[in-house]
Amino acid sequence: MKILISNDDGYQAPGIVALHDALKTLEGVTVQVVAPEHNNSAKSNALTLHSPLYVHQAASGFRYVNGTPADCVHIALTGLLGYRPDLVVSGINNGANMGDDTIYSGTVGAAMEGYLFGVPAIAFSQVDKGWGELEAAAAKAREIVAQLRAQNLVDPQAPWLLNVNIPNMPLTALRPIALCRLGRRHAAERVIVQQSPRGEAMYWIGGAGPAKDDAQGTDFYATAHGHVSITPLKVDLTDHDSLADWAQTAMRLAPGACI
């Protein structure tokens, strides 16, 4: 099995090193890393379209790109690797990607880029920042990949996208995997305004809001109770529940305009 690994924290981040070292020990597995040169957190699915991308190789063998997480996976799958991987894995991220985070996350964006190309993909994140219990998280990621492989679920003919969040706990303390839906966060914190040395106003995006929907069955609830959360994701953002209602509204606004 051939695995492509990327992330959004950069090719030198402890999370991607730990993930690579764990996955390469799986029997019959080859692992390649193509990751951003620098931290690209919150870049979502952004692609670089108006400037060239350059690929370099570090002494570790990791290849790094002056672009976004999605750039890395995109160019890897469209020519850089020279073959099609069986699995795309992103992470391990320094901090949670739960609920609304998945919209902004470069970690999820890298995995989603693989999924868009028809390759099964997983985004791995640790719940808390700081890399605490990172070896345990990498071991759990390895275990999940091994189990999916053993059950013949790593099938390029039937791609899927999974979002996995791992509490920062010893491996033996982690509770069983919980399959759950995404929760929701409150609105982000207020923008931070500072003054530059030249007297100009500088603006920093505020931190993510606390959990709003953390009810039982959500990723927030699962990880808060020591479980590893797994949420299947999809690309279709259509609100199917309200589609019929909006169709009726559109007919009233512009009769005959709906197809």
Swiss-Prot record:
Binds 1 divalent metal cation per subunit. GO terms for molecular function: 3'-nucleotidase activity; 5'-nucleotidase activity; exopolyphosphatase activity; metal ion binding; nucleotide binding. It is found in: Cytoplasm. Keywords: Cytoplasm, Hydrolase, Metal-binding, Nucleotide-binding. One of its GO terms (cellular component) is cytoplasm. This is 5'-nucleotidase SurE. SUPFAM superfamilies: SurE-like. A divalent metal cation binds at D8, D9, S41, N93. It is an enzyme of class 3 (hydrolase). It comes from the Bacteria. It catalyses: a ribonucleoside 5'-phosphate + H2O = a ribonucleoside + phosphate. PANTHER family: 5'-NUCLEOTIDASE SURE (PTHR30457), 5'_3'-NUCLEOTIDASE SURE (PTHR30457:SF12). Its EC number is 3.1.3.5. The gene is surE. It comes from Verminephrobacter eiseniae (strain EF01-2). Disulfide bonds: none annotated. Nucleotidase that shows phosphatase activity on nucleoside 5'-monophosphates. Belongs to the SurE nucleotidase family. Its cofactor is a divalent metal cation.
